[in-house]
């Protein structure tokens, strides 16, 4: 939609664009409650949160909302993993890039333990509380998921040093039922199941979009 059409209909932006500003997103009470549990519980205690649902139900929108809101909180550093299918070494490299610390394994056996120690030292020095967002988490290798569990178990001065929010489809739920990932499942503190919107919710969303897009 070009500027002339936007002006003709009195709109600040196209309300049907996939690239909506955050204030235009329609947030249901269930999503608000999920965010409240993240802010008041997860980032205080650490561990995992889980968002599941079929493609197109809004999982990525929820992650976008969380990234913006959590990023405004004091002492919180938010990072989004963009390569969920990476191996363990590449996962650590991406974590290092996200949180400004060098995390490159130097040997196969003791390397990842050394990286956990370096990660801990970095957080002790910065006093930041990191939150990691991972979309399409069903693509993650079990070894990487287990490494995340180990990182969320690290503590310093009674502070849990990592919170992780996973989002994925039914394959993620099935993967977390594997025996080697059961310890991770026990650390999921809050869950949100996304569903396709019904008629009333769609109408409420449409009204919200038009109201926020209007001049």
Label every PLM stretch briefly.
Residues 1-45:
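A short, basic N-terminal segment
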Residues 44-65:
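Walker A/P-loop nucleotide-binding motif
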Residues 72-83:
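Conserved catalytic segments around the Walker B and adjacent sensor/switch elements
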Residues 121-127, 131, 156, 165, ...:
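Helix-loop-helix "sensor" segment of P-loop NTPases
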Residues 6, 87-91, 102-147, 156-159, ...:
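Mid-core helix/loop region of P-loop NTP-binding domains shared across ATPases and GTPases
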Residues 11-18, 86-105:
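Conserved NTP-binding/hydrolysis module of P-loop NTPases
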Residues 48-52, 79-80, 133:
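Short hydrophobic/aromatic beta-strand immediately N-terminal to the Walker A/P-loop
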Residues 40-44, 69-74, 121-127, 138-143, ...:
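Conserved catalytic network of the ASCE P-loop NTPase/AAA+ motor domain
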């Amino acid at each position: 939609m070009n500027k002339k059409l936007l002006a003709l209909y009195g709109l600040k932006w196209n309300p049907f664009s996939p690239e909506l500003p955050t204030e235009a997103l329609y947030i249901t009470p269930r999503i608000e409650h999920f965010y409240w549990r993240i802010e008041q519980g997860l980032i205080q205690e650490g561990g995992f949160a889980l968002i599941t649902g079929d493609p197109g139900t809004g999982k990525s929108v929820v992650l976008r909302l969380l990234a913006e809101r959590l990023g405004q909180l004091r002492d919180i550093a938010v990072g989004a993993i963009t390569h969920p299918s990476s191996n363990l070494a590449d996962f650590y490299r991406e974590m290092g890039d996200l949180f400004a610390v060098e995390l490159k394994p130097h040997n196969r056996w003791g390397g990842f333990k050394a990286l956990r120690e370096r990660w801990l030292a970095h957080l002790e020095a910065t006093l930041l509380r990191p939150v990691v967002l991972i979309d399409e988490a069903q693509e993650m290798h079990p070894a990487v998921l287990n490494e995340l569990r180990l990182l969320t178990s690290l503590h310093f001065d009674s502070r849990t040093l990592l919170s992780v929010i996973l989002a994925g489809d039914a394959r993620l739920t099935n993967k977390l039922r594997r025996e080697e990932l059961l310890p991770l499942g026990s650390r999921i503190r809050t869950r949100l199941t996304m569903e396709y919107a019904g008629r009333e919710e769609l109408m409420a969303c449409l009204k919200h979009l038009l109201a926020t897009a209007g001049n």
